[in-house]
């Protein structure tokens, strides 16, 4: 099982949904970085369950404990271990699926691969694991802030409801003022109503999280196999429920001619090389070109629904699976900080890797 990500800035997550704790060990964090524990906790609060009527009602404080690697408020350069203790497990809600495979869950594949599985809340395959990524991502954001790299994500689609406004015309921080995390209040209200109706119908719905990375210097990315967009895609696709990733013009770019799609270069008043358009999404040849990096991440509907479904058990017999427990009717409101965290982890790793190969 692969539980570690990164080359220089490396994270290893541990823990299960209904185990004692979930946590992360971060190796490669530079020394003498001021560690703002309040900021880490605020990032955890953005992801935690029970924060509104349109997310799971599992009640967890998700209070982070820093176990090592920090002294007098600064990183020491040694591994930083952080942990959150689980408090509101209701494992009995899952006893009915101990021998049954839930449709579109990881139950069957984990059972077949490992010959054994923790069925309580999905065990290691649960999205609760992502709290560890958010904690590590908060550290990454602190480092990136020192070099003026800023990452912001927001909900741009829920089911058929789309926010079509270009990100440059949006006040992205406004996304944090509503429970869906969409920066357009009018669209947000429609999304919230749609999710609430879906929940009342005992069903779930998917959505899209858009992300913008500003202030990226030219040169981040390691061709040919560790291209910047390839690693961003890998990081996003490792998040639970993600079914798609596109950056820049994405799939819409196939409808353009090369004469339309090419980003023409020019020199600005300071002599910096810029592009007139940004269909490349800030990345060319797998290397950042100094423009904004922007991408979109598609999340499927949550697999656990409160409607009876036909499935099979571990004996191959046809059974009925009914959803129990507490689950999100739509993951995207809580996925926003997870997308930001994984983007931050990727970007800080590439920043440090770039520093390692240049002497100037």
Curated annotation (Swiss-Prot):
Protein's name according to its UniProt entry: Chorismate synthase
TM segment ranges: none
The protein's role, per its UniProt record: This reaction introduces a second double bond into the aromatic ring system.
Alphabetical keyword list: Amino-acid biosynthesis, Aromatic amino acid biosynthesis, FAD, Flavoprotein, FMN, Lyase, NADP
Pathway the protein acts in: Metabolic intermediate biosynthesis; chorismate biosynthesis; chorismate from D-erythrose 4-phosphate and phosphoenolpyruvate: step 7/7
EC number: 4.2.3.5
Cofactor(s) of this protein: FMNH2
Binding-site residues for NADP(+), renumbered to this chain: 47
Gene Ontology CC terms: cytosol
Gene transcribed to yield this protein: aroC
GO biological process: amino acid biosynthetic process; aromatic amino acid family biosynthetic process; chorismate biosynthetic process
Assembly and oligomerization: Homotetramer.
Positions contributing to FMN binding: 124-126, 240-241, 285, 300-304, 326
HAMAP family: Chorismate_synth
A single MF term (Gene Ontology): FMN binding
PROSITE patterns tied to this protein: CHORISMATE_SYNTHASE_1 (PS00787), CHORISMATE_SYNTHASE_2 (PS00788), CHORISMATE_SYNTHASE_3 (PS00789)
Cofactor note: Reduced FMN (FMNH(2)).
Family statement drawn from the similarity comment of this UniProt entry: Belongs to the chorismate synthase family.
Substrates-to-products reaction catalysed: 5-O-(1-carboxyvinyl)-3-phosphoshikimate = chorismate + phosphate
Top-level taxon: Bacteria
């Amino acid at each position: 099982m692969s539980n570690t990500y990164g080359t220089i800035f490396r994270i290893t997550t541990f823990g299960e949904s209904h185990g004692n704790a979930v946590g992360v060990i971060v190796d490669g964090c530079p020394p003498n970085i001021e560690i703002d524990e309040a900021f880490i906790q605020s990032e955890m609060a953005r992801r935690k369950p029970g924060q509104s009527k349109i997310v799971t009602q599992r009640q967890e404080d998700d209070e982070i404990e820093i176990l090592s690697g920090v002294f007098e408020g600064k990183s020491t350069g040694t591994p930083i271990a952080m942990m959150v203790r689980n408090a509101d497990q209701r494992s009995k809600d899952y006893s009915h699926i101990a021998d049954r495979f839930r449709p579109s869950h990881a139950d069957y594949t984990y059972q077949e691969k490992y010959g054994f599985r923790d069925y309580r809340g999905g065990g290691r395959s649960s999205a609760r694991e992502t709290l560890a990524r958010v904690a590590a991502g908060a550290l990454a954001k602190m480092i990136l802030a020192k070099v003026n790299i800023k990452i912001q994500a927001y909900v741009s689609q829920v089911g058929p409801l789309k926010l079509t406004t270009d990100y440059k015309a949006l006040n992205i921080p406004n996304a944090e003022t509503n429970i869906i995390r969409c920066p357009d209040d009018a669209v947000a209200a429609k999304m919230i109503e749609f999710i609430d109706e879906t929940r009342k119908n005992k069903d779930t719905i998917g959505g899209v999280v858009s992300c913008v990375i500003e202030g990226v210097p030219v040169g981040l990315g390691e061709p040919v196999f560790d291209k910047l967009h390839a690693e961003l895609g890998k990081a996003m696709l490792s998040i639970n429920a993600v079914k798609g990733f596109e950056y820049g013009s994405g799939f819409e770019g196939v409808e353009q001619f090369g004469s339309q799609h090419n980003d023409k270069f020019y020199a600005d008043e300071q002599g910096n090389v810029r592009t007139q358009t940004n269909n490349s999404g800030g990345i060319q040849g797998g290397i950042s070109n100094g423009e904004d990096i922007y991408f979109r991440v598609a999340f499927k509907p949550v697999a656990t629904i409160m409607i009876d479904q036909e499935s099979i058990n571990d004996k191959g017999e046809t059974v009925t699976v009914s959803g129990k427990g507490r689950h999100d009717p739509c993951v995207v409101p809580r996925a926003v900080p997870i997308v930001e965290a994984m983007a931050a982890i990727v970007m800080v790793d590439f920043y440090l890797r770039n520093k390692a190969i240049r002497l100037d």
